[in-house]
């Protein structure tokens, strides 16, 4: 054993390693050239004996200055081509040296782009990556934690003992370690020691797979190992703007759409049953469906209904079912509740094969305080603001991202690109945008901080949203970016180069509240609230609006859509059909929440599944038939979608018949005379000869009637259509004399010939 004048230094470094306080293990560990010799130092806690295997020779490593620090002398530079033979408690195994890999994984260009917030593929560097270096397979770990005192990899590989595998701190607060002993499927966390000496066990913010709740470790997973066959879909999607096409969205929550008996286990490809993931105590003996089962059952169902897109409530990994997915801890991982990342890829792939787009709810506005998550990540407020007046949603119990920090914005923007690139999704809906835009959102006076100009706008969040949308459309020009924004913030759907937020669709929350308020009123009193049903057109062209009846409107005592309606069951069904038909004829893209398509009666409950048994009853079948036919009509009649955002596409015929609660309007595609006339009767009265003015004489075919018997209605109508009569009304010389069924919406199409 060579003598060294650095004995005290080596002993000090070894003590730091034992106490998990060393941020530079490569300084002492691995191969070093010293006094004309190659020295290898190995850190092996609780090892009894260590040997080095190199070029068919074995060299004993002696313990130096610390019982777990071993040193051996080799005759030449070993590079990466040696192995360590370790004996512990009578058990011997051989492995490569984690500290023999000395090159930086994250290079200068990567660090620079990340530091300025512009590394749009940062997930290809951060996190856990299965790689092969110098013929040795293993896992490269990389994490950003600039304020940590030390970080170790912990997992089954080392009995979750942070003393075994300290990471190397690099420039820019990056930590790295190559683990040649780890493989796909291994569970791990980062053990982070703070400057104050506290120890946190954190899941990987960039992890591609996590354990099923209640466990919360990260799992080593391959990234690029799926064969897509949707290239034509992606090409068509990105060749033109999607907002000028029909968009009808089925919003849903994967965990509460349909449950399965725990006795009926999902079988893996090898025939082995998969451990079931229990649904909830509310329905003992039931389990969640897997991604493959959802592929088999959900996609045909949505296709049969005629929806163009599925919108999934958040599927990023989250620990608490009751958050509905909106309190995310695993931003780069589809939740393991339903299966593997590749199984989710196959779900998206199959959606595209069947002509269905996939929209994900994305939650960049806040994150939970779970100890294994982003909160106080490296002992400091790294991802969140330190001041709770700008860094916390107290009402929600969550933290707010610090959008002024480049690396935090990079984490989020890259995450957005990740879902499109790695999972081929077609759109996002950004949740709770208003909570991001305003510093005083849900805050009383004295509990928020004005911006630099003294206002309540969150300037940093605005810039983040603009950056996210700008980058998204740079990479994926055919993407959908939908804002759930509940205020009158201007230019939400205007391009960023015009000063807008850059979304291309915005949920019309005003329309939704007005319509639900209107339909909850007894029909006999609706005449006093006519403005509620007509007001939306006055601002309809200020943004690119999507009409949404979402999950938020069927929870927390609000009742499901059917039970919001007044009157007996017949009137509830008729009102529901009338509202849905009016929605499909009103300008704007469409979104409804699962269960509305067949008249769910109970409020949505995340722990339960839908009331599928209701489809045994004709009125509920009728509502589902209505949705099927509305979606078919919607896609076939360009007048219903082509000019959603152009005033040319809509014209009132009469919006002032308050006493009858009747409205009528036209939808137009182009300058031909084949427009649609829509007439809505929002009372139970039947009108036998109601006159509606039209601009051109001829035959108007009745192409839809929400009162049809197929939908559970009374089947009153106009015998297939009407010829105009010479009658001056509504500033037109021609009119249709129509039968208006009770609580109904009828659609007529002008034809050049009968």
UniProtKB/Swiss-Prot annotation:
GO molecular function annotations of the record:
1,4-alpha-glucan branching enzyme activity; cation binding; hydrolase activity, hydrolyzing O-glycosyl compounds
Its job? Catalyzes the formation of the alpha-1,6-glucosidic linkages in glycogen by scission of a 1,4-alpha-linked oligosaccharide from growing alpha-1,4-glucan chains and the subsequent attachment of the oligosaccharide to the alpha-1,6 position.
KW DNA-binding (keyword) present: no
Q: Which domain of life is it from?
A: Bacteria
Where do the catalytic residues lie?
Answer: 431 (nucleophile), 484 (proton donor)
**Per the similarity annotation, which family is this?**
Belongs to the glycosyl hydrolase 13 family. GlgB subfamily.
Which GO cellular component terms, listed alphabetically, does the Swiss-Prot or TrEMBL entry include?
A: cytosol
Q: Pfam families, from UniProt? A: Alpha-amylase (PF00128), Alpha-amylase_C (PF02806), CBM_48 (PF02922), GlgB_N (PF22019)
One of the GO biological process terms: glycogen biosynthetic process
Protein name, please? 1,4-alpha-glucan branching enzyme GlgB
Q: What organism is this sequence from?
A: Prochlorococcus marinus (strain MIT 9215)
What's its catalytic activity? Answer: Transfers a segment of a (1->4)-alpha-D-glucan chain to a primary hydroxy group in a similar glucan chain
Keyword field contains RNA-binding: no
Q: Name the enzyme group at the top EC level.
A: transferase
What's the gene?
A: glgB
Q: Which CDD domains match?
A: AmyAc_Glg_BE (cd11322), E_set_GBE_prok_N (cd02855)
